[in-house]
Design a protein with these regions (language model features):
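Histidine/acidic residue-rich metal-binding segments in metalloenzymes
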Residues: 1-139
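A residue-identity detector for tryptophan
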Residues: 15, 22, 175, 228-229
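His/Asp/Glu-enriched, well-ordered alpha-helical/loop segment
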Residues: 36-62, 111, 138-139, 144-226
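A generic structural micro-environment signature
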Residues: 73-76, 104-106, 120, 124, ...
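Flexible loop/turn segments at secondary-structure boundaries
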Residues: 74-76, 97-100, 146-149, 196, ...
Length: 229
C-alpha cells in the first residue's frame, strides 16, 4: 500500500502481475487437462484474488496501476468492472494467451510452460473479445527467451518462458483476420495502446509515440499483411 501511495504522489504508474504467490505455485492451468496429465494446477482464483487485492489498494490510494498479462475470462470481467467504476487501471494480454489454450500443451511440450499458464478455450475467447472492444489496452509479446537446456526437461522442471517478439506483429494481424477485427484496431493494440499505457514515461516521445502526427518522430514499420513466413 505504501508503495502505491508513493507512486500516486509522484504520478507514477505501478506495473503489477496479478497472481497470488501461494496459489500460483503450479505449472499448468487448473482443469481436467492438468488433472489427466498429473500436473499441479494454477487456479483462476490465483488471478482473481490478486486482482481484488490490487483494486482495493487502488481505491484507497488512487494510484495508477497497469496489470500485466491477464489470462482468464473471470479476470478480464473484474478489469471491465474496475474500469467502469472509474479506477485508473490498464491491462495487457500476451500473444500466447490470445492464440493458445491448455490443449496446446500437447504431450508435455515444455515450450508451452508459460506464466501465466495457457487456460481454457472460454478464457481465450473472452480475452480476444476484450482486446477487440478496448477493455484490454495492449497486446504484448511476453518475450522471455529461455536457454534450450532449461527447456529440454520434464514439463514441471522446465523454465518458464518463450520467445515471441518476432511474432508479435504477425499474430496481431492474424487475430484481426480471424476475428473480423479492423486492421486499425489490431495495429493500435501493438502501437498506440502500449504507448498510451507508458504515457509520460516515454519523455519527449510521448506526444507522438504509437501514432503518426505532424512533427512527431517517424517511427515506422512497413509490413505485408498477406505475406506468410
Amino acid at each position: 500500500q505504501r508503495a502505491l501511495q508513493y507512486a500516486g504522489t509522484f504520478g507514477y504508474t505501478v506495473w503489477l502481475r496479478p497472481q497470488d504467490a501461494w496459489l500460483g505455485k503450479g505449472v499448468a492451468a487448473s482443469g481436467p487437462l492438468a488433472t489427466r496429465m498429473g500436473l499441479s494446477g494454477i487456479p483462476v482464483a490465483a488471478e482473481l484474488i490478486a486482482l481484488h487485492t490490487i483494486f482495493e489498494l487502488v481505491r484507497s490510494t488512487r494510484a495508477r496501476v497497469h496489470l500485466c498479462r491477464i489470462s482468464s475470462a473471470a479476470g478480464i470481467e473484474l478489469v471491465r468492472q474496475a474500469k467502469a467504476e472509474g479506477l485508473p487501471v490498464t491491462c495487457d494480454v500476451s500473444v500466447h494467451n490470445l492464440h493458445l489454450i491448455d490443449v496446446d500443451l500437447g504431450y508435455f511440450d515444455s515450450r508451452t510452460r508459460l506464466s501465466p499458464p495457457l487456460r481454457q478455450q472460454r478464457d481465450r475467447e473472452a480475452l480476444r473479445a476484450a482486446l477487440a472492444d478496448g477493455t484490454i489496452d495492449a497486446l504484448v509479446s511476453d518475450h522471455t527467451p529461455v536457454d534450450e537446456d532449461a527447456k529440454v526437461l520434464p514439463f514441471a522442471e522446465a523454465e518458464v518462458g518463450a520467445t515471441a517478439l518476432e511474432l508479435l506483429l504477425s499474430l496481431a494481424v492474424r487475430w484481426a483476420q480471424a476475428d473480423g477485427v479492423g486492421m486499425q484496431r489490431a495495429l493500435a493494440t501493438v502501437t498506440h495502446g502500449p504507448a498510451s499505457v507508458l504515457g509520460h514515461s516515454l519523455g519527449t516521445l510521448s506526444a507522438s509515440a504509437g501514432r503518426l502526427v505532424e512533427g512527431g518522430v517517424a517511427d515506422l514499420c512497413i509490413l505485408d499483411a498477406e505475406a506468410w513466413w
